[in-house]
């Protein structure tokens, strides 16, 4: 984690320059600008890359991902062993031996920036409101990142697991700081402490005009997400209700249109000449995603550098192909044509910017889904189904949506979880698989199966087919930490057990 104690404000780092005049307060473009004002603190936070982290786990490690043998064989060079196939098959040695883990590094970069803001807050000039906003954002960002790290690198929360390994709780700026992992209970205690501090300094009740600035609505929504992950459904429901009081309106997907002109591709020895029908969001950059998609409570993305999120048949089959606009616009038929070397016809999941991003941020839809699931699990199953009626109306072609129905609580839970899966695939599925494994209801358990090939860290052995079976209860869902980080810590960071 090579980090600096100064804001590096080269021209390329200036975030969203056309969006708001708040950038007039940003320090000069020279490098090594010290943090001396509250505006400097907010500039650290507003830096655009703070809004996303690279995440191959989200793209490839769940049952939402699909890389059939035939797809791989059509173009092996498209599927990197370390950054695609190892994550796809949960191949431990391959993940450990990656040259860098971008999710781990990006999250600790965000944590470092939060620590810089917190440690500098008593020494800067500016109004108390500006300082409070900076502190609220910093504590929130740190809590968000610690929870993200816990989701991917720790065992799921339960009374049994609370003594398992947590994540390094870096709270200062010193490189000599203790980086031992502590326990999962200690990690969550820090997350809750940071959220409490964020709320104490919050100056916005609802989502502000700069949507990534923190509000009490966002704090409540993150509490709801965390308590859902912990299986504390009464608490999650309470915070979801608080968040919904100030949440933005649902984004009506009937507002979306097709990109025009459509991307055109010439004929090849495998593909005919074609135009791909893609949603207008295929052409949305980060700026448009942040501002045009008005449902954000707190925007955040999982970046997929490969731009290859290929959905499984089971995921595709969850949708109404005729009327569900999530399927119509985001699952691109013949989408593998986008990668010219792949000679295998399949869908490509592409919600944003030519498949560069998956949603990982807080939205009104997610909070409604949290509320509905908690209602059902707490016995209020008719109310839980009704909670999702507005969401389905906003996601289906006009006048075609229907209310979810069930005959009992078990059926209602299945309906709500399937709706959650349709709305929040890939990124959210990872955490869901883990938490389902520790609920008292075994009906939600998931096992991921891969029919692929035997692998080493340098080679895919196409002469040796192999089936990988990863139950949700497997300890391997606490993903291994890459070896460079273990080595650089001189053993202070303990590796996850097999």
Q: What does each model-found stretch correspond to?
A:
Residues 111-114, 188, 195, 240, ...:
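Inward-facing hydrophobic residues that define packing positions of alpha-helical scaffold repeats
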Residues 80-153, 182, 195, 199-207, ...:
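Conserved, well-structured interaction surfaces
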Residues 48-56, 230-231, 237-364, 411-447, ...:
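Extended ligand-binding clefts on enzyme/binding-domain cores
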Residues 19-67, 316-322, 399-400, 442-498:
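Membrane-proximal, proline-rich intrinsically disordered regions
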């Amino acid at each position: 984690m090579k980090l600096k104690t100064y804001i590096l404000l080269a021209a390329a780092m200036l975030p969203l320059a056309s969006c708001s005049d708040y950038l007039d307060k940003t320090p000069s473009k020279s490098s090594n600008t010290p943090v001396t004002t509250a505006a400097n603190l907010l500039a650290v936070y507003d830096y655009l890359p703070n809004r996303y982290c690279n995440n191959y786990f989200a793209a490839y490690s769940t049952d939402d991902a699909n890389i059939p043998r035939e797809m791989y064989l059509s173009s092996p060079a498209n599927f990197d062993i370390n950054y695609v196939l190892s994550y796809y098959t949960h191949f431990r040695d391959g993940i450990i031996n990656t040259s860098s883990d971008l999710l781990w590094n990006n999250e600790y970069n965000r944590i470092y920036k939060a620590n810089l803001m917190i440690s500098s807050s008593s020494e800067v000039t500016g109004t108390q409101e500006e300082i409070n906003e900076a502190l609220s954002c910093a504590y929130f960002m740190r809590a968000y990142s610690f929870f993200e790290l816990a989701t991917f690198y720790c065992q799921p929360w339960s009374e049994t697991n609370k003594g398992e390994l947590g994540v390094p709780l870096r709270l200062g700026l010193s490189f000599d700081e203790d980086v031992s992992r502590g326990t999962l209970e200690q990690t969550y205690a820090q997350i809750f402490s940071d959220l409490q501090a964020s709320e104490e300094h919050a100056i916005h009740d609802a989502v502000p005009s700069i949507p990534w600035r923190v509000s009490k609505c966002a704090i409540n929504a993150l509490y709801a997400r965390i308590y859902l992950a912990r299986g504390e459904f009464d608490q999650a429901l309470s915070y979801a209700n608080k968040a919904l009081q100030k949440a933005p309106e649902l984004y009506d997907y009937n507002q979306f249109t097709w990109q025009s002109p459509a991307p055109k591709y010439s004929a090849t020895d495998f593909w005919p000449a074609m135009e791909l029908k893609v949603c207008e969001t295929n052409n949305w950059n980060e700026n448009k995603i942040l501002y045009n998609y008005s449902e954000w409570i707190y925007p955040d993305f999982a970046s997929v550098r490969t731009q290859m999120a290929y959905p499984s048949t089971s995921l595709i089959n969850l949708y109404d192909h005729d009327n569900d606009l999530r399927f119509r616009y985001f699952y691109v038929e013949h989408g593998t044509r986008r990668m010219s070397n792949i000679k295998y016809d399949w869908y490509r999941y592409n919600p944003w910017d030519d498949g560069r991003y998956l949603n990982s941020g807080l939205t009104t839809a997610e909070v409604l889904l949290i509320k509905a699931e908690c209602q059902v699990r707490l016995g209020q199953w008719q109310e839980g189904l009704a909670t999702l009626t507005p969401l389905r109306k906003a996601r289906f072609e006009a006048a075609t949506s229907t209310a979810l129905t069930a005959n009992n609580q078990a059926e209602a839970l299945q309906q709500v979880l399937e709706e959650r899966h349709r709305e929040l695939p890939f990124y959210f599925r990872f955490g869901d698989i883990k938490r389902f494994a520790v609920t008292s209801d075994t009906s939600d358990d998931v096992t991921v199966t891969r029919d692929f090939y035997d692998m080493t860290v340098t080679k895919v052995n196409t002469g040796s087919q192999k089936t990988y079976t990863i139950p949700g209860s497997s300890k391997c869902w606490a993903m291994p930490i890459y070896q460079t980080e273990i080595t650089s810590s001189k053993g202070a960071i303990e590796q996850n057990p097999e």
